[in-house]
């Protein structure tokens, strides 16, 4: 896949969600922004996607409960948000 911007989330043990805006190339990736504000993450991602004329993807997640009753959030794919 060519250069693109991706938004992903990480749920900490204490319940805090951290959002990451990542610029990905064929062989490398770099974190452009990270923080706990969802709106700021999407604003940064849209701004960078438009500035660099690259597509923007959001990571889709699915909740699963294992045999011990622990809930896990698993990434299942990417959704294309904007093509420039």
Placement of each model-derived feature along the sequence:
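Short N-terminal "domain-start" leader segments
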Residues: 1-42, 51-53, 58-62, 66-84
